[in-house]
């Protein structure tokens, strides 16, 4: 663990440009990384918060083929969407680059050449899967088959998304090409491999011995499992037509493997930022007094904790990550998030449909963050978090303080009189919160830290509820001056402590309190007010108060200062807004079922005479009742136009008797009678299933009379 670092390099996993950003990405990576970076800046730390678009690899080529465009058009489209979404959502990157940039191609090529020239790669001719019909090798997601570890029949050539195992394409059982559907053959090809087995002792000492107590159990456990299972050489090149050329002779038609190329994107993005800011990039990656932290999802643990560190170690001049606080997965309404199935809450759509509610989503995702286990996002929980917590606790406290200050003192903060024991206890408790929240943030427990932030608002609400200044004002207005002064100190503290978690709210609260007018007052406070930080998204962080000022000063907002009028920080979200989102997901679910529903194979051929033997009539259900002691059966009286007959039908789990009386149906009238539970059934009701797999009646769309035949 890096002690007292001079600077921080914070990386967030490069989002893949084959689709927009969804809430799973935010909860797993970008919101916690942003909280951490903003927190460090509030302490005046030197922070480089780095990210960029991951634009190479098989998934990009597949997306381009599917959309009938070039890979460049695909990455340009999604890089634009992703970049704008992050900016609008307030993710405060110092630099957001892209791996298609020249600086990245140069950096990745140079990194490869360094290891190549040092003899760190194994050059080997191996047999790889090849699609003879498409005339190309099948890397990664160009092939699908059964996972050898969990029997998932839809595992990819690089990873099984069901069990999380990292695979080679040749590991798959019964592989199929995703290009043509053909069974691939094995064909020889030359590639370069990073011999991970050579780094097993280094990784064991560095991680298993050195980070046993400070890395998250889910990360440590997965890494230990990999190391204990025995590390093997890992390919760093691929037979592809999209990506970074392998920069050595004899490598024509080969590209750098995306998981060799992508993490180097952190370095090239840092170079890009440093060049723009007139800084030296190397200390952020090569100085032992720099703390390097990778924020990722659990599916990237092996790459950031084993492969990339082995690459850095092999190169020889880079520092290693101090921590990799990977999160588990976020599910949506009980189901796994899926870009391909459109089962997601897309960030760009959320920002359009919930304008000015960036912080509500940040709050909901952090409150329910999958820090140690998979968690579930539901729209009802999102609504409850907003209405019952942000509105009722945080917003309610601030609104009461500002309204009362304007009502009693025309917005001018009163001079306090003598503090009571309750006042002093409340202010002392307030001063303790920065350290409490810091402890959680610095251990990457952001959900816990957010809970402590809300406890600050609860402290304010409790103080007002116990002191009741609106009642005291009648008999002791001098006492109310002190009460309001104390409450305003809590509000001022919230404007700082909320900034990492709820940056838009913090900025709005700072504006309401007119903290920008207090620079002279804060001259004796932290040096941070003299610094102005501007990130790549043009989000200005211009705080007049630093994090530690709350613990060190009692007059965060002084007597005589005039605040602004009250504005609602949060608005209640109505049921109709939430139902609209739930309906949207239900429509997606129905569409997915319809798309994935495969028709049953055609039955053996019959002669026309065989069909002509069936007497199918239109009828109407006159009566319906449940069959005693039979959960699946209904006893129906049906007018077939020929007669009224009894038919026993196995539809009780799909329909109640009441809802089908009067229903028009198709009846196989000349089916031989059959006794079911002692009741003779004289025919069969024809049914099918809809896109959701539910039983539905086969009935005429025109007004055919009972007894009409189906020919």
Curated annotation (Swiss-Prot):
Documented EC number(s): 6.1.1.10
Cofactor: Zn(2+)
Annotated residues for binding of Zn(2+): 147, 150, 160, 163
Assigned GO CC terms: cytosol
PROSITE patterns xref list: AA_TRNA_LIGASE_I, TRBD
Subcellular location: Cytoplasm
Motif, 'KMSKS' region: chain positions: 336-340
Regions that span the bilayer: none
Catalytic reaction equation(s): tRNA(Met) + L-methionine + ATP = L-methionyl-tRNA(Met) + AMP + diphosphate
GO MF assignments: ATP binding; metal ion binding; methionine-tRNA ligase activity; tRNA binding
Keyword terms: Aminoacyl-tRNA synthetase, ATP-binding, Cytoplasm, Ligase, Metal-binding, Nucleotide-binding, Protein biosynthesis, RNA-binding, tRNA-binding, Zinc
Disulfide bonds: none
Cofactor binding note: Binds 1 zinc ion per subunit.
All residue ranges annotated as the tRNA-binding domain in the record: 610-711
Top class in the EC scheme: ligase
InterPro entries: aa-tRNA-synth_I_CS, Anticodon_Met, Met-tRNA-synth_bsu_C, Met-tRNA_ligase_1, Met-tRNA_synth, Methionyl/Leucyl_tRNA_Synth, MetRS_core, MetRS_Zn
Short motif ('HIGH' region): ranges: 15-25
Biological role: Is required not only for elongation of protein synthesis but also for the initiation of all mRNA translation through initiator tRNA(fMet) aminoacylation.
Family label: Belongs to the class-I aminoacyl-tRNA synthetase family. MetG type 1 subfamily.
Subunit structure: Homodimer.
Protein name, entry field: Methionine--tRNA ligase
Lineage: Bacteria, Pseudomonadati, Bacteroidota, Flavobacteriia, Flavobacteriales
């Amino acid at each position: 663990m890096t002690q007292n670092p001079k600077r921080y390099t914070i990386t967030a996993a490069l989002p893949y440009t084959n689709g927009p950003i969804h809430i799973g990405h935010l909860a797993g990576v970008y919101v916690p990384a942003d909280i951490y970076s903003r927190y460090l800046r509030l302490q005046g730390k030197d922070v480089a918060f780095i990210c960029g678009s991951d634009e190479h690899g098989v998934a990009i080529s597949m997306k381009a083929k599917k959309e009938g465009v070039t890979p460049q058009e695909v990455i340009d489209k999604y890089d634009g969407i992703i970049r704008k979404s992050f900016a609008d959502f307030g993710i405060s990157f110092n630099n957001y680059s892209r791996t298609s940039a020249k600086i990245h191609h140069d950096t990745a090529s140079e990194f490869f050449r360094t290891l190549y020239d040092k003899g760190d790669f194994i050059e080997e001719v191996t047999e790889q899967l090849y699609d003879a019909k498409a005339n190309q090798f099948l890397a990664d997601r160009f092939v699908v088959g059964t996972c050898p570890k969990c029997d998932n029949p839809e595992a990819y050539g690089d990873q099984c998304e069901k069990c999380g195992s990292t695979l080679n394409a040749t590991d798959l059982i019964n592989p199929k090409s995703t290009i043509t559907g053909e069974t691939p053959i094995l064909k020889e090809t030359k590639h370069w491999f990073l011999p991970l087995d050579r780094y097993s002792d280094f990784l064991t000492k560095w991680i298993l011995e050195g980070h046993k107590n400070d890395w998250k159990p889910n990360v440590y456990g997965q890494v230990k499992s990999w190391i204990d299972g025995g590390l093997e050489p890992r390919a760093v090149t691929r037979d592809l037509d999209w990506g970074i050329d392998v920069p050595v002779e004899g490598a024509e038609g080969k590209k750098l493997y995306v998981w060799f190329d992508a993490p180097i994107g952190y370095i090239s993005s840092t170079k890009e930022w440093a060049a723009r800011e007139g800084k030296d990039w190397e200390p952020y990656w090569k100085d032992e007094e720099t703390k390097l932290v990778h924020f990722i999802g659990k599916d990237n643990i092996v790459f950031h904790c084993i492969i990339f560190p082995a690459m850095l170690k092999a190169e020889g001049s880079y520092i290693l990550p101090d921590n990799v606080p990977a999160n588990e997965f976020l599910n949506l309404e009980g189901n796994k998030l899926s870009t391909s199935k459109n089962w997601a809450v897309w960030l760009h759509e959320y920002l359009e449909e919930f304008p000015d509610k960036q912080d509500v989503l940040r709050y909901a995702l952090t409150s329910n963050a999958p820090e140690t286990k998979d968690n579930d996002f539901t729209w009802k929980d999102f609504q409850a978090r907003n209405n019952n917590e942000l509105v009722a606790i945080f917003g309610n406290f601030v609104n009461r303080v500002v309204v009362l200050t304007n009502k009693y003192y025309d917005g001018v903060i009163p001079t306090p009189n003598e503090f009571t024991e309750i006042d002093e206890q409340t202010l002392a408790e307030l001063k303790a919160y920065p350290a409490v929240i810091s402890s959680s943030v610095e251990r990457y427990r952001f959900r816990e830290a957010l809970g402590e932030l809300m406890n600050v608002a609860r402290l304010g609400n409790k103080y007002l509820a116990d002191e009741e200044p609106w009642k005291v004002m009648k008999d002791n207005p001098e006492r109310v001056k002190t009460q309001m002064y104390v409450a305003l100190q809590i509000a001022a503290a919230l404007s700082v402590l909320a900034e990492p978690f709820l940056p838009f709210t913090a900025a709005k609260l700072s504006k309401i309190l007119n903290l920008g007018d207090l620079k002279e007052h804060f001259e004796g406070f932290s040096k941070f007010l003299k610094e102005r930080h501007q990130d790549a998204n043009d989000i200005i962080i211009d705080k007049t108060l630093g994090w530690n000022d709350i613990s060190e000063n009692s007059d965060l907002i002084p007597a005589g200062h005039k605040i602004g009028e009250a504005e609602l920080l949060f608005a209640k979200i109505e049921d109709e807004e939430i139902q609209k989102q739930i309906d949207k997901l239900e429509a997606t679910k129905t569409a997915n079922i319809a798309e994935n529903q495969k028709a049953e194979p055609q039955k053996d051929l019959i002669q026309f005479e065989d069909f002509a033997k069936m007497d199918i009539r239109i009828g109407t259900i006159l009566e319906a009742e449940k069959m005693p002691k039979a959960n699946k059966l209904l006893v129906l009286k049906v007018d077939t136009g020929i007669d009224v007959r009894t038919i026993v039908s196995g539809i009780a789990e799909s329909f109640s008797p009441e809802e089908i009386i009067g229903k028009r149906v198709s009846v196989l009238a000349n089916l031989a009678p059959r006794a079911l539970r002692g009741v003779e059934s004289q025919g069969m009701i024809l049914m099918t299933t809809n896109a959701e797999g539910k039983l539905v009646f086969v009935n005429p769309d025109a007004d055919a009379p009972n007894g009409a035949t189906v020919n």
